Amino acid sequence: MAMLSFEKKYRVRGGTLIGGDLFDFWVGPFYVGIFGVMTVFFALIGIALIAWNTALGPTWNLWQISVNPPDAKYGLGFAPLAEGGIWQWVSICATGAFVTWALREVEICRKLGIGFHVPFAFSFAIFAYVTLVVIRPVLMGSWSYGFPYGIFTHLDWVSNTGYSYGQFHYNPAHMIAITFFFTTCLALALHGGLVLSALNPDRGEPVKSPEHENTVFRDLVGYSIGTIGIHRLGLFLALSAVFFSAVCMIISGPVLAEGGSWPDWWNWWRNLPIWNP
């Protein structure tokens, strides 16, 4: 892929966190870096382990392939590879790949002299993943509470986990997370629609400026958050959705015991004096 005209001046030495100039180069448009090499290493090992697990299993059907966590009897210890140990090592490799990818993003930001908003945002995705495969299982005392790596088995795990707490939609953190997800979609749709409207005026009309964009929302709702503000708001909404998604899993089991009911948890609300004078 050809280098764009402005890219060459940004391809400079330095900005690395460790390793100095080792792997401080580009392959085509992609910056490598020592963390890029580590990401590829973890990813390849993880993929190889998944292939090995599949070879041990009953099928090569893509929809039915699954790398399952260990049985509850192993607790937080290491399980034999064929009995969940592969899942443990795949989780280690996945975590390593995600973390080193984020550190690669940090190095790119340092080279460009920009803020670290991209790796900061990506770290929330890492937190959500680690919550599911490390934090929640550790709090519940067994790796068996991790989710399986498989298309259908993962969906089954989501369904079974939800119904094991009565009705997961009553989980308060789940409510907040879903609200942020929907609000993120609304904000992005409004922002995207507004920008495209300003860039696609009637034939013969000039492209509209941010002043026009601000005026649309001042006319519509009486206030415009501004061109920078909408991106800050979008980042906040998206990260909040991911954060509360992780929280809703952390409190399901460690806080509300397994077999408990989220609908029943709300009895404190129904029993408030304002409803029962």
Curated annotation (Swiss-Prot):
Query: What is one cellular component GO term in this UniProt entry?
Result: plasma membrane light-harvesting complex
Q: Which residues cross the membrane?
A: 30-52, 84-106, 113-135, 173-195, 233-255
Q: Name one GO molecular function term.
A: bacteriochlorophyll binding
GO BP terms: photosynthetic electron transport in photosystem II
What InterPro entries does this protein map onto?
A: Photo_II_D1/D2_sf, Photo_RC_L, Photo_RC_L/M, Photo_RC_L/M_CS
Q: Where does (7R,8Z)-bacteriochlorophyll b bind?
A: 154, 174
Task: Please list the residues that bind a ubiquinone.
Answer: 217
Residues given in the record as Fe cation binding sites: 191, 231
Q: Which UniProt keywords apply?
A: Bacteriochlorophyll, Chlorophyll, Chromophore, Electron transport, Iron, Magnesium, Membrane, Metal-binding, Photosynthesis, Reaction center, Transmembrane, Transmembrane helix, Transport
Tree of life domain: Bacteria
Subcellular location field: Cellular chromatophore membrane
Membrane topology, as annotated: Multi-pass membrane protein
What Gene3D superfamilies does the database record attribute to this sequence? Photosystem II protein D1-like
Q: Does the keyword Nucleotide-binding apply?
A: no
Main role? The reaction center is a membrane-bound complex that mediates the initial photochemical event in the electron transfer process of photosynthesis.
In the record, the note on similarity to other proteins reads: Belongs to the reaction center PufL/M/PsbA/D family.
Quaternary structure?
Reaction center is composed of four bacteriochlorophylls, two bacteriopheophytins, two ubiquinones, one iron, and three highly hydrophobic polypeptide chains (designated L, M, and H).
Per its record, how is this protein called by name?
Reaction center protein L chain
